[in-house]
């Protein structure tokens, strides 16, 4: 059993993560404000001292706190996604954390196959495969902030020996939400089919992210479901952390 601190625990991925880990680990949810039904440590990721105090005595940090809006303005992502992530890494170092799982995103590579460069959540009809180690091509300030977060984690891994997993998370939706999205224009529906992450696969992926022995650090892998329309590779995720996705958007929308 590990002691795990989860920032951004009230978000969609955060709630799934806390539920997935709570049965086998001692989980400390961390949120920006009180949330109904969630007993959490309340703090602002812009407060490094508060983060350090919250991380003390833990083994692993799962850093999910961020402004996740791909249309967010620069000031918003700068303060939370960039400044806040720096604070999380500094606090993790001060608290002697063993592993940090950083919630990155498919948006670090989305410009490779975007249908409309002004609309991050669209996908071209002729999408080509993008490898995990291909150069970043973010589609938004949000994507830029996650490229920074990955690079920062790589630095802390190489400089300080912190075990770092950059987890490029797709779009967490229920099956019903996926079906609803199919009524939107085709470039959006195509994006959803490619980037879907089911709740069940998200739970499994987050468990593997904290429990698997990493073959290398820093390490970056994708976390989406086994969608027929995906252009991001899951080979590295399966090999590195033993992820075995069970869901496929094609079976949901057929």
Swiss-Prot record:
Q: Catalytic activity, per the record?
A: alpha-L-arabinopyanose + NAD(+) = L-arabinono-1,4-lactone + NADH + H(+); alpha-L-arabinopyanose + NADP(+) = L-arabinono-1,4-lactone + NADPH + H(+)
**UniProt pH dependence:** Optimum pH is 8.5. It shows 50% activity at pH values of 6 and 10.
The family assignment reads:
Belongs to the NAD(P)-dependent epimerase/dehydratase family.
Q: Which InterPro entries does the entry mention?
A: Epimerase_deHydtase, NAD(P)-bd_dom_sf
CDD domains xref list: SDR_e
Name of this protein: L-arabinose 1-dehydrogenase (NAD(P)(+))
**Binding annotation for NAD(+):** 142, 146
Source organism per UniProt: Haloferax volcanii (strain ATCC 29605 / DSM 3757 / JCM 8879 / NBRC 14742 / NCIMB 2012 / VKM B-1768 / DS2)
Temperature note from the UniProt entry? Optimum temperature is 45 degrees Celsius.
* Keyword terms, alphabetized: Arabinose catabolism, Carbohydrate metabolism, NAD, NADP, Oxidoreductase, Plasmid
* Gene3D superfamilies xrefs: NAD(P)-binding Rossmann-like Domain
Q: Gene for this protein?
A: xacB
Gene Ontology BP, a term:
L-arabinose catabolic process to 2-oxoglutarate
Tell me, using the record's free text, what induces this protein: Transcriptionally up-regulated by both L-arabinose and D-xylose via the pentose-specific regulator XacR.
UniProt-annotated catalytic positions: 142
């Amino acid at each position: 059993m590990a002691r795990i601190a989860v920032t951004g625990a009230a978000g969609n991925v955060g709630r799934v993560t806390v539920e997935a880990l709570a049965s086998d680990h001692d989980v400390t949810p961390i949120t920006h404000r009180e949330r109904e039904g969630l007993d959490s440590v309340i703090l602002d990721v812009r407060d490094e001292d508060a983060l350090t105090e919250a991380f003390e005595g833990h083994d692993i940090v799962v850093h999910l706190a961020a402004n996740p809006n791909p249309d967010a303005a620069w000031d918003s992502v700068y303060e939370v996604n960039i400044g806040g992530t720096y604070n999380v890494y500094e606090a993790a170092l001060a608290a002697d954390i063993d592993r940090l799982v950083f919630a990155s995103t498919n948006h670090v590579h989305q410009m490779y196959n975007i249908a409309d460069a002004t609309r991050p959540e669209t996908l071209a009809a002729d999408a080509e495969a993008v490898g995990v180690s291909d150069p970043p091509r973010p589609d938004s300030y949000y994507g830029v902030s996650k490229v920074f977060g990955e690079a920062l984690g790589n630095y802390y891994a190489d400089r300080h020996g912190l075990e770092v997993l950059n987890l490029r998370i797709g779009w967490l939706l229920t099956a019903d939400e996926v079906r609803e999205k199919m009524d939107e224009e085709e470039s959006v529906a195509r994006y959803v089919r490619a980037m879907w992450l089911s709740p069940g696969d998200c739970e499994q992926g987050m468990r593997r992210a904290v429990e698997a022995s990493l073959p290398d650090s820093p390490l970056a892998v994708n976390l989406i479901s086994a969608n027929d329309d995906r252009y991001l590779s899951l080979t590295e995720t399966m090999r590195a952390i033993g992820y075995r996705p069970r869901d496929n958007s094609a079976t949901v929308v057929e």
